[in-house]
Amino acid sequence: MVREPVKIQGTKEGLVIVVDEDVDIEVLKERIVDRIEKSLKFFEGATLNVRVKNSKFKDEELEDLKDFILKNYGVEIFIKKFQEKHIKNVTDDEIFNGLEEGITKFHRGTVRSGQVVKYYGNLVIIGDVNPGGLVQAAGNIVVTGTLRGIAHAGFTGNKEAFIVASSLKAMQLRIANIISRAPDKEEEVEYPEIAVVRKNKIIVRPLYHLSDLW
């Protein structure tokens, strides 16, 4: 089997590009650009970890690479050395499992009808999600305002993910492959709520009742 000099791996830190020894800086640049251009919406406003065990890269080469990616794609890159044994290789479908901690994207502003915000980590919406808006996260979803659209947490299959909103009025809730909708309420509630999976069903509880859930 031919060894892949530039590998895309998933860790609890999120998406990581692992660079083997003797990789040319231009090859690294091409692979990063190729990956970003295939998933522009995913990388929007995100950060990318690049782990290298190649000491021949000059500092100015790495800085030029970081500046190029940030300027042209708006993606911030963090580069550091690594020891390969510390990186766990997983499949793309398992790319994010860190629910207690891990990479988090903050989306500022209202998610409007027809708009999709998707992230392979935890997702925080600083604003509302309007009817017809869709937010998706491999991890947890937190909406600081009113959630009226569709929220899909743990979309890679993680049933431990949760959805929190200051006002939960969702058209539909999804956690992993389980689908539900926010329950109809006889009267408006004035407290945040959390949706979790219990016994293979999505349940919604007041956020202050966390002790009943865990």
From Swiss-Prot:
Question: Could you tell me the keywords of this UniProt record?
Answer: Cell cycle, Cell division, Septation
Keyword hit for Cell division: yes
Cited InterPro entries: CAP/MinC_C, MinC, MinC_C_sf, MinC_N, Septum_form_inhib_MinC_C
Mention one GO biological process in which this protein takes part, according to its record: division septum assembly
Database matches in NCBIfam families: minC
Q: Describe the task this protein carries out.
A: Cell division inhibitor that blocks the formation of polar Z ring septums. Rapidly oscillates between the poles of the cell to destabilize FtsZ filaments that have formed before they mature into polar Z rings. Prevents FtsZ polymerization.
Oligomer and partners: Interacts with MinD and FtsZ.
Q: Which family does it belong to?
A: Belongs to the MinC family.
Q: What is this protein called?
A: Probable septum site-determining protein MinC
